[in-house]
């Protein structure tokens, strides 16, 4: 998921993506705590995807405020 793809989405779609990513991050942290996580790098990619979505949402909010 790159920033350009995210910028083409509506704010509602971005919020849905954000909820989905946060749920996935929670599940990955839970798996890590119980020792069931096999792909540790997935935590980092999900966390960065959350940051990307939040950045684009903030850009859209700032753009709408102007």
From Swiss-Prot:
SS bonds (residue pairs): none
SUPFAM superfamilies attached to this UniProt entry: Ribosomal protein L29 (L29p)
A cellular component term, taken from the record's GO annotations: cytosolic large ribosomal subunit
Ranges in a coiled coil: none
UniProt keywords, alphabetically: Ribonucleoprotein, Ribosomal protein
Metal-binding found in the keyword field: no
GO MF assignments: structural constituent of ribosome
Protein biosynthesis is among the record's keywords: no
GO biological process, one term: translation
Highest taxon above the source species: Bacteria
InterPro entries: Ribosomal_protein_uL29, Ribosomal_uL29, Ribosomal_uL29_CS, Ribosomal_uL29_sf
Family under the similarity heading: Belongs to the universal ribosomal protein uL29 family.
Annotated protein name in UniProt: Large ribosomal subunit protein uL29
Natural source organism: Ruegeria pomeroyi (strain ATCC 700808 / DSM 15171 / DSS-3)
Organismal lineage: Bacteria, Pseudomonadati, Pseudomonadota, Alphaproteobacteria, Rhodobacterales
